[in-house]
Amino acid sequence: MTNKKALINKLSQPDNLRKILDEKSFVPIPSCFDALSAKLIEQANFDVTFMSGFAASASRIGSPDLGLMTFSEVFDQANNICNAIEIPMIVDGDTGYGNAMNVRRTLKECSKAGCAGILIEDQLAPKRCGHTPGKDVVNREEAFDRIRAASDMRNEGYDILIMARTDANHTHGLGEAISRSQKFYELGADIMFIEAPKNKEEMRTICKEVPGDKIANIV
């Protein structure tokens, strides 16, 4: 067993992810879609993987990322991945599959399965890939309720890092997206995700004005 694997086995997956984020200023996180792709990422010596809803939907049901996969299907995919690898995995929890009560259950089950983190976003259900036209976001209070519910559930003992995503940049502009992300951080989110910055200047502004860890994706 390698020293890296020995360390992982001593820590919970959320704590291991926290340690990685604390120790490194930049962490590449390749996306997986099933147990095999996750194992290949692990064997390539990456520290973390992310179960992409976009990729999982294509792989499992052969359909685009339009909110067609059920929570049960997503959970089954995430559970299989967690059982196959030792590096931490962040699961794409989409909108939480309903209201705040659904978000609580989604987080609880993903935490019990061994996920290190979970993404919860503010799109209107049924959601769609963040890089496609026609998407919309819920109002501020509903968006905040989702992250508040996730934080409350974590504080009840179901440890997991919360990645709070907003798609408001596309529909309401960068200022609204930053404002939502700042509130997500106040509510307990660990990683802030403003979807689809339009250019490098927007990315610089996000890094300057949004607290906590930040993530950007490359499709």
Regions found by a protein language model. Give the residues of each.
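Alpha/beta enzyme core
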Residues: 2-219
